Swiss-Prot record:
Belongs to the D-alanine--D-alanine ligase family. NCBIfam families: D_ala_D_alaTIGR, PRK01966.1-4, PRK14570.1. Cell wall formation. PROSITE patterns: ATP_GRASP (PS50975), DALA_DALA_LIGASE_1 (PS00843), DALA_DALA_LIGASE_2 (PS00844). The keyword Cytoplasm applies. Mg(2+) 2 binds at residues 311, 313. This is D-alanine--D-alanine ligase. Its main location: cytoplasm. Keywords: ATP-binding, Cell shape, Cell wall biogenesis/degradation, Cytoplasm, Ligase, Magnesium, Manganese, Metal-binding, Nucleotide-binding, Peptidoglycan synthesis. The gene is ddl. It catalyses: 2 D-alanine + ATP = D-alanyl-D-alanine + ADP + phosphate + H(+).
């Protein structure tokens, strides 16, 4: 008997359109597997309301939310639409960015007591916040690029002190980032003290916490991992960016691969570099209690060969140009089997969690 699976996508996020493209790829794989009754839940970009769709398309068809049935979540009862309990057995969230990768949806589904593909609340929340994630990674002795972090309130109190810290602790150039946002949105490079204020102001449009890192000339290496306690680490790949300062939003989604962007899988690395990257990826996945999947991104400094962990993506892209599935495919795991495995990991994680004692009679 087929299980009922809900594919969730869209979201109130700058990465809404990317989520829709990822969902389409996952939807096709689910159709190909023919193991699940698929329910597609679209989250409206403006209102955050969940709607039930008949299917997922690419490019997304115009969605008339006035005629679509709303999806309702009732803890203890289930997920409903059209006054019917859909009896969902597992949820596959493909919501990138806020509410999708920050532990919000994961928390909702935990309250609903429904298995969820991917990391749980803690792993998602920590991985999505660049500032807190970097602080934690330092405690694991995982190398990261020198950085400082601060909140908007701190900046409003004494912006000159923060600018002095940037100059004295990091030196220029630096890269300025919102702490919680994906796809390199809101990120800019400041080459001098004259540019730092405008870069900070731009980043503050997207988040209340800002991370500023020393800018290094580096290769961008990515590593896919799947599994729960027992994990599989795939051959790392490299993103070669030719006409951009770094792998920003435009480079990721507005450029045809093969022109300004080249994907090398596997990445050309020294043996010791390859081993270090896989070891760091393993430590991150284990210590942050990640589940299901992750893409761990690294910098390899061009001059010294020094490795730095950049960031962790707990819901990586599933589009046709996304590195996560490409690296899995290179090592022999085809896309539909990857999707099937991720769903199995969700059930395994759920069953393991249900064995714990929540209360005593």
């Amino acid at each position: 008997m087929k299980k009922n699976l809900m594919l969730i996508f869209g979201g109130v996020s700058f990465e809404h359109e990317i989520s829709c493209k990822s969902a389409y790829s996952v939807y096709l794989a689910l159709l190909d597997l023919n193991k699940y009754n698929i329910y597609s839940a679209y989250i409206d970009k403006c209102t955050g309301i969940w709607y039930l769709l008949d299917s997922v398309s690419d490019p997304p068809k115009p969605i008339d939310t006035d005629v679509l049935p709303i999806v309702s979540l009732l803890p203890g009862f289930g997920i409903f639409s059209n006054n019917k309990n859909l009896e969902i057995d597992v949820v596959f969230p493909v919501v990138h960015g806020r509410t999708g990768e920050d532990g919000a949806i994961q928390g909702v589904l935990k309250v609903m007591d429904i298995p969820c593909v991917g990391a749980g609340i803690i792993g998602s929340a920590i991985s999505s916040n660049k500032y807190f994630c970097k602080l934690l990674l330092k405690s694991f002795n995982i190398p990261i690029v020198p950085f400082i972090g601060f909140r908007q309130y701190d900046y409003s109190l004494d912006k000159e002190e923060i600018k002095r810290n940037v100059k004295e602790v990091l030196g220029y150039p630096v890269i300025v980032k919102p702490a919680v946002l994906g796809s390199s949105i809101g990120i800019n490079v400041a080459y001098s003290e004259n540019q730092i204020e405008s870069c900070i102001e731009e980043a503050l449009k997207y988040d209340l916490t800002i991370v500023i890192e020393k800018f290094i000339e580096a290769r961008e290496i990515e590593c896919s991992i799947i599994g729960n306690e027992k994990m599989k680490i795939f051959s790392p790949g490299e993103v070669v960016v030719q006409d951009f300062i770094f792998y920003d939003y435009d480079a990721k989604y507005s450029v045809i691969p093969g022109n300004s962007i080249i994907f090398n899988i596997p990445a050309h690395l020294e043996t010791n570099q390859l081993l270090s990257i896989k070891e760091y990826a393993f430590l991150v996945y284990k210590n942050l209690e990640l589940r299901g999947m992750a893409r761990v991104d690294f910098f390899v400094e061009k001059k010294s060969g020094t490795i730095y962990l950049n960031e962790i993506n707990t819901i990586p892209g599933f589009t046709d140009i996304s590195m996560f599935s490409k690296m899995c495919s290179h090592d022999g795991l085809q896309f539909k089997d990857l999707i099937d495995n991720l769903i199995d990991y969700a059930f395994q994680s759920y069953i393991n969690r249900k064995k714990r004692i929540n209360f005593k009679d």
